[in-house]
Amino acid sequence: QNRHPPIPPAP
């Protein structure tokens, strides 16, 4: 279970 906000995809 991830307890961190989703990381946006890099451009």
Curated annotation (Swiss-Prot):
Keywords: Hypotensive agent, Metalloenzyme inhibitor, Metalloprotease inhibitor, Protease inhibitor, Pyrrolidone carboxylic acid, Secreted, Toxin. GO terms for molecular function: peptidase inhibitor activity; toxin activity. GO terms for cellular component: extracellular region. One of its GO terms (biological process) is regulation of blood pressure. Expressed by the venom gland. It is found in: Secreted. The modification Pyrrolidone carboxylic acid is found at residue 1. The keyword Secreted applies. It comes from the Eukaryota. This peptide both inhibits the activity of the angiotensin-converting enzyme (ACE) and enhances the action of bradykinin by inhibiting the peptidases that inactivate it. It acts as an indirect hypotensive agent. Belongs to the bradykinin-potentiating peptide family. This is Bradykinin-potentiating peptide 11j. It comes from Bothrops jararaca.
